[in-house]
Amino acid sequence: MAIGMSELKKGLKIELGGVPYRIVEYQHVKPGKGAAFVRAKIKSFLDGKVIEKTFHAGDKCEEPNLVEKTMQYLYHDGDTYQFMDIESYEQIALNDSQVGEASKWMLDGMQVQVLLHNDKAISVDVPQVVALKIVETAPNFKGDTSSASKKPATLETGAVVQVPFHVLEGEVIKVNTETEEYLEKVK
């Protein structure tokens, strides 16, 4: 199905030249002279590169053949990550470039969304909020009470986030995976 210029918006998935993209930013421009156009930044699902593209009135792009499947992350083995389709129990292996930044939030057994393009896995999305255990952080010192102060904490997946001083090693915290920010302690 063709997508017209007027339908473009942030987050929309499009296909150009057989490559699936996600619109990460767009701006509708109405110059004083000439026809209106849309200037967009689009990110490739295949290699993660962001390019700037201009769409003019009448331009059309295709809707990509993308399917999102819920899969369970099993384990990391060298340079591959093993996943299992929770419906068919079929297992697939993805490499570092396919998993990308999601790897620093994934725990064995976690359910993730795997994006397929023409039945080939191209990316992995983790939940927006995950609960992870702190394995290393600086100890608290008397007087560390300023609410604005933060310290680095290493999580069980290896990711490092900034946490308030009152958070201790061994505690489980919730983290926003998009902003990589501490949200709260898990009680």
From Swiss-Prot:
Pathway: Protein biosynthesis; polypeptide chain elongation. InterPro entries: Elong-fact-P_C, NA-bd_OB-fold, Rib_uL2_dom2, Transl_elong_fac_P/YeiP, Transl_elong_KOW-like, Transl_elong_P/YeiP_cen, Transl_elong_P/YeiP_CS, Transl_elongation_fac_P. One of its GO terms (biological process) is peptide biosynthetic process. The keyword RNA-binding does not apply. One of its GO terms (molecular function) is translation elongation factor activity. Keywords: Cytoplasm, Elongation factor, Protein biosynthesis. Its main location: cytoplasm. Gene3D superfamilies: 2.30.30.30, Nucleic acid-binding proteins. The keyword Signal does not apply. One of its GO terms (cellular component) is cytoplasm. It is found in: Cytoplasm. It holds the Pfam family EFP. HAMAP family: EF_P. Involved in peptide bond synthesis. Stimulates efficient translation and peptide-bond synthesis on native or reconstituted 70S ribosomes in vitro. Probably functions indirectly by altering the affinity of the ribosome for aminoacyl-tRNA, thus increasing their reactivity as acceptors for peptidyl transferase. Belongs to the elongation factor P family. This is Elongation factor P. It comes from Helicobacter pylori (strain P12). The gene is efp.
